[in-house]
Structures are given as structure tokens and as C-alpha cells.
Amino acid sequence: MLEKFCNSTFWNSSFLDSPEADLPLCFEQTVLVWIPLGYLWLLAPWQLLHVYKSRTKRSSTTKLYLAKQVFVGFLLILAAIELALVLTEDSGQATVPAVRYTNPSLYLGTWLLVLLIQYSRQWCVQKNSWFLSLFWILSILCGTFQFQTLIRTLLQGDNSNLAYSCLFFISYGFQILILIFSAFSENNESSNNPSSIASFLSSITYSWYDSIILKGYKRPLTLEDVWEVDEEMKTKTLVSKFETHMKRELQKARRALQRRQEKSSQQNSGARLPGLNKNQSQSQDALVLEDVEKKKKKSGTKKDVPKSWLMKALFKTFYMVLLKSFLLKLVNDIFTFVSPQLLKLLISFASDRDTYLWIGYLCAILLFTAALIQSFCLQCYFQLCFKLGVKVRTAIMASVYKKALTLSNLARKEYTVGETVNLMSVDAQKLMDVTNFMHMLWSSVLQIVLSIFFLWRELGPSVLAGVGVMVLVIPINAILSTKSKTIQVKNMKNKDKRLKIMNEILSGIKILKYFAWEPSFRDQVQNLRKKELKNLLAFSQLQCVVIFVFQLTPVLVSVVTFSVYVLVDSNNILDAQKAFTSITLFNILRFPLSMLPMMISSMLQASVSTERLEKYLGGDDLDTSAIRHDCNFDKAMQFSEASFTWEHDSEATVRDVNLDIMAGQLVAVIGPVGSGKSSLISAMLGEMENVHGHITIKGTTAYVPQQSWIQNGTIKDNILFGTEFNEKRYQQVLEACALLPDLEMLPGGDLAEIGEKGINLSGGQKQRISLARATYQNLDIYLLDDPLSAVDAHVGKHIFNKVLGPNGLLKGKTRLLVTHSMHFLPQVDEIVVLGNGTIVEKGSYSALLAKKGEFAKNLKTFLRHTGPEEEATVHDGSEEEDDDYGLISSVEEIPEDAASITMRRENSFRRTLSRSSRSNGRHLKSLRNSLKTRNVNSLKEDEELVKGQKLIKKEFIETGKVKFSIYLEYLQAIGLFSIFFIILAFVMNSVAFIGSNLWLSAWTSDSKIFNSTDYPASQRDMRVGVYGALGLAQGIFVFIAHFWSAFGFVHASNILHKQLLNNILRAPMRFFDTTPTGRIVNRFAGDISTVDDTLPQSLRSWITCFLGIISTLVMICMATPVFTIIVIPLGIIYVSVQMFYVSTSRQLRRLDSVTRSPIYSHFSETVSGLPVIRAFEHQQRFLKHNEVRIDTNQKCVFSWITSNRWLAIRLELVGNLTVFFSALMMVIYRDTLSGDTVGFVLSNALNITQTLNWLVRMTSEIETNIVAVERITEYTKVENEAPWVTDKRPPPDWPSKGKIQFNNYQVRYRPELDLVLRGITCDIGSMEKIGVVGRTGAGKSSLTNCLFRILEAAGGQIIIDGVDIASIGLHDLREKLTIIPQDPILFSGSLRMNLDPFNNYSDEEIWKALELAHLKSFVASLQLGLSHEVTEAGGNLSIGQRQLLCLGRALLRKSKILVLDEATAAVDLETDNLIQTTIQNEFAHCTVITIAHRLHTIMDSDKVMVLDNGKIIECGSPEELLQIPGPFYFMAKEAGIENVNSTKF
């Protein structure tokens, strides 16, 4: 039929059976024309429908678009001309075949359709159509056959169809031009990402990414260089899609759970399921409280959670991406098995000299084409999968964050902040990782089945022997993996312990330096590190066995298979076709067999993460239904029979509260510890579980928590808290909250970076910023949970007057104030006394006193136990009937000019205190003006900060290539001798690899010499034996290389860790002041972990890949020396691609790390401050911040993923060209090459693509991971403090007297800063008791630090008992002094270790010290006594007990000099008295220097030293100084000590 249609032969095999084969013209004009046209017409409706549904606006007409339309217009004209020519010919005598009418007519319709599609896509602002690009490629490929046929015809002198041929050539040229234009992208200024407008060819080759690669090569990339992600990748878009499915699937899972529970309940004879309450949502069963074990014992059951819904939700969200990637992977897998078949044809071609040459060329072209299609499909598949992984991670991270904002307290109690952060980081990452390779599950099975099928065709049943070996290896690997996992778990525990100690060391480094305890703690860390390295070595040695088995498996498989094949039947002779085709198939089989168990393991790990995420995301939300907001309510707040609890099964914490609070009232809530004061506020915020009753609130709420929550940012940002800046209001708030003097001190003022959790601020400063934040918001109701607890009494008074009180900024607002301060109660409108969660009393101050109930009783007790500062203000009511009056006056009476006192006490105590009111007024005015200027010119101010004024130094991030010296340093740590033997073993492995391939080639050549009947058994056995021996040699040399390297790498890890630890412990204190602890811990955690695990693996892989590529190229060049000419340009391309990629990839990895940390920090910060965020209703703002952070990280991750694809496609092209040119050489030189040589060369060439790719990745990995060594080295070069011990040592009994002399002593914190002590000169006699006082920043603590040489002298000297302390070792000095610091820092370990880490004292001495420290009875009551374990930072002891333990340390050391650095500032009155009494008795014969916080603690001193601005401005006995109206006199007066002359303490 088609022959009539064409009027010529449609098909005849004889056309191909000739040296110059060709296809029949009819076939070319029908089938090869209709294939591309059919593709276009079939898919065009779908394409146009997609365009029709698109809502994108029309774009402007571009030159590129016009050019393509014009060229298609020319094609249309050419088709019309051809049709006209046909009609002209047909009018003559000759009969024109139907095909000559049909084709131009079809083309006319097709070009019109193309014009329509191009126009519609331009109208929709779509990128160039991949659909049209594929059509042009298909049309050009199909047209190639007709093109060469017409050329041949013309060359043969047949010009009968000259006009038609010319039209075809012109049309063909225009199609090529259109395809070239299609490779370019339309300019679209609205797009932030070129990938969204990239053409089809640009997309599959990733050439749109060239500009980033070029930029990254020229200079280090910055965040601004990296493009934003598409809208479809944005967090907001992904979460919106995912949440829709998540809610639906979660509801289904909850209903299914409810049905199961109901069914179970019915089966249990209607027994009620514990934990299930009709008033609760079913997801409540997902909750497990902290005391779950106790409740399990009670109920004997475990609560269920909705399960198996997360994966369904993810699948429904991203199923289209999964479908696309599935199709691409399927095509890739099919084409994987094309290469071995083409290899077989090429070997056959080389073996048979009679085969036509064109068959060889066709096979070479098909081999290249198959490899190219495989590469494009594989890289597109990976791009889709990795993008999907990022999308899944983003959706999970954003959902976990959003859930954290709504999760109930009951559900939240299960998770620490760290565990919740882990859900975002670790669990989301595991789901991302498994998503990247999830198709490998079915793909591995498919590849295994197809491999065995094709192997069976080559070798028959013999293949089962090889497969059997592979199957046997799987359980061996499983056993080895299990053992490896056990070692890893053990090692992780050791690592956790080491990092825990390191964290404690760094947190308490000052204590370690004060007590010279560094060696003891260094030894603890080193001992744990030894265990860690021992496990690491054991793990590495086990990995050597794993690698040995892995290396030996393919050799063993091929040896066993080939041996069985030649042994089972004497007719079976191994020829080149069978051997090398089988080797290629075995190489394909290796990958899925190794990947399948890994994938199953990864899936199991991911399932654990899925369960954890399901439990968290399926947890109950906060139920705020009991909190009713009514804007028309007549009261500000009303509690109606309100009872609330923290846990469902526990008793109510707030019970049956009935309370009305009117608008504008100031209500104080008081009561003993545990009475429910904070719980009352939490109930109002909706943070507790409602038992019954409700709370009605009118208006918006602000909340100041007891433990202040500060964000990592500037002070100004913390106060504004996302609201608009109002200069006037802002200044009022700063002054009212007593923050102006603090801002004067802080570098940068209100623009000062205050660090994570307000690390650079005192507790009082943090509390005042927290209060300022609430005050600035100007809301209706203020819930204040003991905001004055962390501030000085006088600062508290100032804040009460200026902010909280009747005349404060918040007057007219409704205020609920929880407080322990009795002084302010007379000024409140109403007092609510709580006891055991209920209201015991309520009423006005005078009314409650008149009742003489619980409140009046507590007030009397308070006044009896108040310190001297308060006692001095008590009205002397001697008569019984004056009791109530005395109570009132004693609380109401306050010192004059509270604002002045506050400012002087906190920051601005000047020598001219006699003119305090006037001077302070002027000072505050100037300070306000300066702050106003600072706010207006904030940017300028920030830029002009004095050098050295930054509190925390920004972490230095290396850019560009890592210096060679870093590599050299690491190699020296491994050991040059070890490196030599490691490389030698790897080289010998490569030699054995080349030898085994050459031997196999020789073995297959036997088939030409011998036939099946006369093949000698001895020859056969020798071939099998030597081949097996060479394979075994490969395994042995790899084992030796890995085994030796294990020792070398562990040795390097040990050296680097030891250097880092020693140097950090010897670093001066200023290093720790300017470097966040987390940054140092990261060196001991992340960087050491990289040096332990990742870097060694990368180095081994790099050496293996490098030698593998060299081996392959050597073998190819040995077979065909002319191939060397091809290797050189390919090598240049390869090296160039590598250089460009590594520079970019390295910086993108750094950017990924830099942008990932803020996500987790922000999340951790959010979880810590949830009640505040929810109270201010700022959830949406924080969600937006989270989205911005995730998107910032996403663009770095996406860019890094794309850089990998950019690299892979180019390397695979180099690899494919290597295979193509190898095949081409085999065809060209087939007369000089045998089939076994061809098989030998091509089977190795087929492996080179993957190895080339892996080598560049390993190069990049090494460059990325060597940064860890760079970072460690940076800290090993930190300047050290003075030597611990020197040759000049003091006498053993030094100091015997305790006499201290300061001679013009000067000191500064850092070289670039001003002096903090300016010429201190004084003599402290033996056994003198010295009190040191002064304002904040006067230099009191600096004086202490100088004694211990924490700060080194900038001038002058300190002499103790005749010895200049600068002339002796630090430990010789510090071991002879004792300090009781302000913060009682303990370390995890036994009580004994905390008292005596060096075991220098006997048990009797320690018990004696504990007795004197008033701790003996407490320690004796403990089950383990001195061995009792102290938790991290002493968390299981009270602050008082911790401070008494510090006293115990001091008592043990029996030093002649004792320093008390505000040691009782943070303890209660009882503990304070205990410490003071013990010091007076036990250190009577010592020199005692007390840095005073409470003046009464130094009133019995021999001398008082008053410091200001780093100088001694007064010095003398307390009695003398109180006679003179000087600084000390005014300080005593401010403290409320009125009768200064007669006061005796």
C-alpha cells in the first residue's frame, strides 16, 4: 500500500546488506516524516490547553520570539512553494505520487500549529517549550536520513528532483536555526531565577547556571550572588499545599484511631480506655507526659497516637514530582542495559572482519547516543529527586515550627528545646535524604532482575553461582554493619560525654583558671578521647573488612561464574563477547546489590523519624476556649469559678478562682513559693488546661515573664518587638525602665548586639528590657510575673514609680503584678493573696492589715528578717496599738529622689555626689539627647564604633582555596611514613587491577587458539587460578591500604584534638569573653567529627578514584596509543570543569552552613519564648521570619544541588566522549585489534564516566572537609596566657603572711581598649579584712582578676609576701589563692570531684570542710554521700547549696588570701548569714578581700576601698569614712542606713 503511495519501494533488507547501506526513500518520506509530525499533533492539544488554563499575563514581544516566528513563517512559505511545484508537475503528463501532495500539506498545517503554539506561549509568559524543542530535535534527527540520501543522489548525478532537494535543504537549515534559537532563553526581568525561564536545552545541560559558576570561580560567592528559588519552591507555597493534605490525612488517622479504640473498648466488655475523655480531642492520646512511667504503672496502658498519615500527606502533595522522576529513572535503567548489548556487537564486529564498517560506526554512535540519553535522564531524575527532598524538608521544618506555636503545654512537656530542634534538623534531614533515593527501591529490584536475565543469556545457569556469591555476601555485610553500628553507638556515647564536659569546661572556664584546675579537666577529656579513638580505630578496622569483602565480591563473582561456566561443560570456552559483556553486566549488578540493603536501612531510619514527626505534628493544640475575649465587657478581667491544671490527670493548680479586675486597676498577687501566682497568669494567657469555669478578658494583653526572654538581636529590636518606631514613646520607655545608663555603657548603645539569650547582659538588664518591650507596646492589660525580682531594690522602686505605679507610664492600664516586694503594696489598688492555688484573701492594703489575717502575719515576718537596709527605715512603733501604723509606715517610707539613686547605683555614681540631684538631672538630659541622636543616625553610629567595642567578635569565615599549608599540616599529623605505605598499597591495587584485566583479555584470546575439544585443562586451570589470585591481590592491597590508613587517620585525629584542647585551656580569658561558647564547642564537635570520620573517607575515595581513572586511561592507551591524542583535550576539559565547580561548590557549602544555623537558632529562641509570643499575638510575624530564614537557606541548598548537576552532566559528557572515541578507535583500527582487546578497552571505558564524576565530588568533599582542619588550626594558634609553671617557683609555704602590695597597677581587658584600672597603689596588711565597693564598671571585679592574673598588667606590679606575681607561673600563683565567686559554678561529677578534683585531700578533711560549710548533714543524708552525682551546672542542688559547696572548696585549700567576689549577691538571707559567719570564724587568720554588693557585709572590715573609674577615690575604716560626707557616706545613706554613726553590724 505504501509502495503505491510513494510509487517506490517502501522496505527491502537488501538496502542494508551492502558496504554503503541506505534506507529506501519511501520509508524516509513517510515513517521518518510522520513520526515528528505525529508527536506534535498528538501532544499539541494538551499543550494549548495548559496555555489556555494559565493565568499569567501577556509578556512583551522579544527579538528572539520574532526571529523564531519569522523562521517558521519561512518554513510555511517553503511548504506552500513545494505544494505549488507538485501541482505544476501534476498538470503535466507525469504522474506525481500521493506522498508528494501529502507531505507539503501536512507541513503547512504543522507550521501553522507551531506558529500558534509559539504565540500562545509568549502570550502566557512561559519559558521556551520543551515540547517544541523535542519536536525540532526529532524532526532534524529523522530528516538526517533523507538529507544524506538526497546528497548521495545528487553526487551520483541524478538531478531529477533538484528543486525538491533544494527546498528540503533550505527547510532543513531553517529547522536547525530554529533549534539553535530555542536553546536561548527569553529575557524576563520579573524572574529572580533563570531556571524558571531557561530553554529546554539549557535546562537539560544546566547552562543557565554558567554565570554562577563563573562568578564563583572569579571570587567567593556571597548570599546576594545566589538566585532566589522559584515561587513553587518558596516555603509559603509548599506549606500551604502540604498543610491541606496534612490536615485531611491527620483527621482520617484520628478517626481510624478512634474506631480502633472503640472496637477495642467493646471487646474489653465496655471497659473504658484510660486517657480518653469525651471532653478531649482524640489526638490527646498522642501525649506522653514527663512522668509517663509512673502513669503507666497506674493505668497499665499506653496511649496511642495517629499513625501512618505523614507519608500519605507527603505523597499527595508531591505525587506529580514522584511520577516524573519515576519515568525518568525507568528510561535510565532501560538504557543502562543497552550499553552491554552494543559492547557485545562491537566485540563481534571486531572479531568478524567481514562485517560492514558502517555497522561499527553505527554501534559507536548508538553507544554514545544511549549514554547521552542515560546521562540526561539520570541528571534530570536526580535534579527532580533532590528538589523534592528540599521541598519535603522545607514542608516539614515549616510545619514543625508552626506546630510549635500552637502546641499545648501538655504536649510540649514531652520535648526539650533540643529535642524539638532535632525534629527540624535531624528528622527533617533524614526524610530529605530518603526522598533523594527512594526510587532506588524498585529500581534496584528491576536492575537485578534485568542483569540476571541478560547474564543468563550469556552464561546460562552458571550465572547462578555468581549471584549466589553476591547473595552470600549480603548477610556477611549485614553482620559487619551490625557490629559497626554497635561500635558507633558506643562511640557516640563517649562523644556525648566528652562534649558535655567540654561544654562545662568552657562555661566554667573562669573557675578552672581561678583554682588552677585545667590539668584535671584536661585529663578527664583526654581519657574520654582515648576511649573514643579506641572505638574509632575498631570501627575503621571493621570497615577495612567491609571494604575488603566489597572489593573482593566482584572478582569472586566473576571468578566463580567463569570457573563454573568452563568447568560444567568442556564445550564452554570463554570468549571475549561472553567475558566482557558479563563483566559489564556484573558491574551494573554490583550497584543495586550494594544499594538495596542501604536503602532498606535508610527507610527504617526514616520510619523512626516519621513516627517522631507524626507524634509531634499530631499532638494537641493549645485549647484557649476557656479564655473569652469580649470587647464590650464591663470589666477588664473576670475569673468565674476558674480552675486550671498543667496536666489532665493531676489536681488543679489554680482552683475555683473568682476575681473581678476593673479597667485601670493595679492588682498585686502575692503568696508563698508554689502558691500558684505564676500559674494564675499562665491560665489567663491560655497556657494551662481548663478544668472548669472560664476567664473573660477585655482588650489586648502584654506579658512580662519571671524569667526574661530576650531575642538575639539589638536592644532596640527587643524593645520594639516588630512594632513601628515612635521616638517619643521609645525615649520615655528607656528612661522609665532605667535603661539609659546601661545604654551609655554598652558599645553601640541601643544598637548593641546582646547575643544569644541576652548573654552579654546581667539578669537585671534583661528583666528591664523585657519590661520595656511590654511597656512600649502600649496595650490594654499587663500581666507582670515578678518583674522586679532580678533588680536592685532601689532600681525596683524607680521602675515601680516610673512604669508600674499610679503615676507610671502604665497608669490607666490594667496591671496584674505578681511580686515578693512588700514595699509597693500600699500603692496598689487591690491585693490578692494566694495559697495552694486558691484566693486566701483579697482587698486593699489597709483592709487586709485591719483583718490581721495571713497577709498581716506574713508582713510582720518579712520585716523581722529584712536586712539592715530595710531595717533602718522601720518606724519605731513601741506601743502595741501602733502595730498596724508601724507596718504601714515601714513599707511606705522610701528614700528621696529614687531616680537619682537608681542612676547613681547602677552606672553614674560620680565623685561630686553632694550635688547629686542637679548633676544627675543634667546627665540624664544629655544622655537622652545623645541617645536620640544615636537613634536618628543609627547607621552612622554603628559604622563609627570604636575599634574593639564589639562585644562578640564575628566568626571569621575563610574564603577561596584552602591554603596548602593546611593540607601539609594534616599530612604531617598522619605521618609521612604512613602516607608512603598507604599510597604504595593503593598503587599496587591498581597494578593488580590492570593485571587482572589484561589476564582476562589473554584468557578470552584462548578461544581463537583452542576449540572446545582440545582446550587443555592445565591451561584452563592456570587461567582461572591466576585471575583469581590477581583479584585476591586487589582485595589484600586495598585491605592493607585501609588498615594502615586507619592508624594514620586516628593518629592525626588524636594530635589535632590534643593540640586544640591544650591550646584552648591555655587561652587567656579575653578569648572566652569575645568568643561564644557554641563556636568553640563546634570545633570540638563538628570539626573534630569531620576529621574523625568524613575527611578520611573522602581522602581514601579520592585516591581510589584517581588511580582508577589513571589505570583505565593507561589500559586504553596501551591498546590504542593514538587514543592519547584524544585524552589530552578531554583531560583539559575535565580539569577546567573541576576547577570551576570546586570553587563554587566550596563556597555554596559554606553559605549553606552559615544560613542553616539561624533557622535552628530562631526556632530554639521561639520555643523558649512561646508564652511571650502568644501573649503579644505575634505568631504570624515569627512564622514570616521563619519562612524568610528557610527560603534563604533553600536558595543556597538548591544552588548547591544545581551545581552538582551542572558538574555531573559535563563530566558525563567527558566520560561519554571517552567511550565514543574509544569505540571509534576500535572501529577505525579494527584490522590491528582483536575482539578481546576491544572488549577489554570498552568494558573499562564504560566505567570511567562514574569514576570521573566521583573524583570531582571527592575533590570538592576534601576541600570542604579540610576546612575543619583549617578551623581547628585557627584555634591551635590562639595566643596563650603566661606559662602555668616556670623555672622561678615561689617558696613552698608562700604566701605565709598574706601581705599584698599594689604599686601603680594598671590593666586593660584587651590591647585596643582603655585602661580599667588606672594606677592602683595600696598596701593590704597581713590578715586584714578589706571591703571593695564602687559602682558598676568601677573596676572591682577587675581588681580580683588581676590578683589571679586573669588580666595581665599593662603597668605597675602586685607583690604578695615579697614576690612579684608576674614573675612566677600562673598555677603557682592561683593554687595559693582562694576565691568564692559570685556565681557558684559546679561541674557534672561527684561531690568529691567538685571539691577536690586532684584527690589531694583525705575524706576526713573533706567532711571537716563540709561541716564548717554547714553541708555535712545534707551530704550525709545522701545515699552516695561524697560520691553523689552532681548534674550539669549543679542543677540538682539549690543555689544556696551550690554557694556553700564553693565555700567548702575555699575551706579545703586553707589559703592565706581569700577573695569574695560578691559571693552572697544571689543567695537568700539565711545562706548569706551562714557564709558570713563561717568566713569570720575560719578565715580570721587570713587576708580577706570582699567585693561588696550588700553594704552590711563589709561594715565590719578593717578597711573599705572605694573605687571609681579604675581609681581608688577613698580608703579607710568604715567608721572613718562614715564621718566624712564622701562617696562611701552617700552610698550608705542611699542604702537606707540613716543612723550611720551608731550602726553596728
From Swiss-Prot:
It catalyses: ATP + H2O + xenobioticSide 1 = ADP + phosphate + xenobioticSide 2; an S-substituted glutathione(in) + ATP + H2O = an S-substituted glutathione(out) + ADP + phosphate + H(+); taurolithocholate 3-sulfate(in) + ATP + H2O = taurolithocholate 3-sulfate(out) + ADP + phosphate + H(+); leukotriene C4(in) + ATP + H2O = leukotriene C4(out) + ADP + phosphate + H(+). Residues 322-605, 979-1264 form the ABC transmembrane type-1 domain. Changing residue 1291 to L: Altered transporter activity. ATP 2 binds at residues 1334-1341. It is a multi-pass membrane protein. ATP 1 binds at residues 671-678. Glycans are attached at residues 7, 12, 1011. It is linked to Dubin-Johnson syndrome: Autosomal recessive disorder characterized by conjugated hyperbilirubinemia, an increase in the urinary excretion of coproporphyrin isomer I, deposition of melanin-like pigment in hepatocytes, and prolonged retention of sulfobromophthalein, but otherwise normal liver function. This is ATP-binding cassette sub-family C member 2. It comes from Homo sapiens. The gene is ABCC2.
